[in-house]
Amino acid sequence: MTVLAQGCDVAPPNNLTKPVRHESGQREVFCGLTGIVWLHRKIQDAFFLVVGSRTCAHLIQSAAGVMIFAEPRFATAIMEEKDLAGLTDANTELDRIVTQLLTRRPDIKLLFLVGSCPSEVIKLDLSRAALRLSQTFSPGVRILSYSGSGIETTFTQGEDACLASLVPELPAASGKDASLLVVGSMADVVEDQFVRMFEALGIGPVQFLPPRNSATLPSVGPNTKFLLAQPFLADTARELENRGATRLRAPFPLGVEGTTAWLRAAANAFAIDPALFDKVTQPARARAERALDNYRKELAGRRIFLFPDSQLEIPLARFLSRELGMQLVEVGTPYLHREHLAEELKLLPPDVQITEGQDVDLQLDRCRLARPDLVVCGLGLANPLEAEGMTTKWAIELVFTPIQGYEQASDLAELFARPLVRRAKLVA
């Protein structure tokens, strides 16, 4: 089958001079099942059961790197040819597997049935299966479902679908006092840093979605204000707004500038004295700015090309251009959510070329023509581009690595400096 590429330019945001290029064609992305790799570590009493093929099982196993004698909190109910052909009742087999799993693992309190490309192709209704199984195993186990399929999605949308499925389960907030909800997976160490910062500012109560334990689901209601920690949570944000919560407009907490603006949005919403805000944040800001100085020398003036991969590209481009002095050749993103990224777009250079969507062949042609100093791309493109003499950075590493907050600003900068240093050593 031939996929026809379609490209068009759409009006740029107010501060940008170049139209946003929109492309539709062949893509190079992982599927949403990849999100299980970090989500199963985050929610410590949850289990993710993928209903999919052997390919799905190999993807998760290799991406997570779990040793064979470990007892991980994910598995794959493998669909055989007879299931795909409709020769067996997939629901009966799924019920058997879930019963066996929960009998063996009584520590599981939250079970996600995760759809895949094969289960969606045969129209297996996992939402009905989750409802049916919940009636059997509640209240001891909560059973939910979401899609991790790679059909017309990118890999970070797996987390969005997972969290969106959790929102209807969140308890209703009681009382009239305002509360803050931070939405999006972050490393525990990063969460702890933000908790200390919010406590010093006098902001609270502060809760996180996803929680570390399903028994401590955050409450939500009309007095809930929420900050997005990740830019790929459109469905989750919409579900929270349907519950009455209010999203705080802010850049994302990448780098010194982004973290400060993100924290300031919360401080303003809770009427925190600006003098107190400066006093609390200044020490960490100063440390982060000093740490970035070393990497700025290496990265300033370097040209970078970002392929669409994770939806982190716009915040990363802002950080790289404004705090490290890099030149943006092209910033690709799988999907441009203009409302959630409005504060980021205001901070980009006015002449930046943004591409929404992907036609991988056309983007490869532009990348080869530009010959940037550094290319941020998926694993499938990295080795071929390296063979052509380009320096690459794996985009997926930016999702697996703790990069939010002041203390991680230098770690984020190092991720971009490291490939250039490696290349310099190889050619020396």
Swiss-Prot record:
Q: What keywords tag this UniProt record?
A: 4Fe-4S, ATP-binding, Bacteriochlorophyll biosynthesis, Chlorophyll biosynthesis, Iron, Iron-sulfur, Metal-binding, Nucleotide-binding, Oxidoreductase, Photosynthesis
Write out the catalysed reaction: chlorophyllide a + oxidized 2[4Fe-4S]-[ferredoxin] + 2 ADP + 2 phosphate = protochlorophyllide a + reduced 2[4Fe-4S]-[ferredoxin] + 2 ATP + 2 H2O
The cofactors it requires, by name, are: [4Fe-4S] cluster
- For this protein, what is the EC number? 1.3.7.7
For this protein, the record's Pfam families field holds:
Oxidored_nitro (PF00148)
This protein's pathway: Porphyrin-containing compound metabolism; bacteriochlorophyll biosynthesis (light-independent)
What top-tier enzyme class does this entry carry?
Answer: oxidoreductase
Matching NCBIfam families = DPOR_bchN, PRK02842.1
Q: What does this protein do?
A: Component of the dark-operative protochlorophyllide reductase (DPOR) that uses Mg-ATP and reduced ferredoxin to reduce ring D of protochlorophyllide (Pchlide) to form chlorophyllide a (Chlide). This reaction is light-independent. The NB-protein (BchN-BchB) is the catalytic component of the complex.
Q: What is this protein called?
A: Light-independent protochlorophyllide reductase subunit N
Name the gene behind this protein. bchN
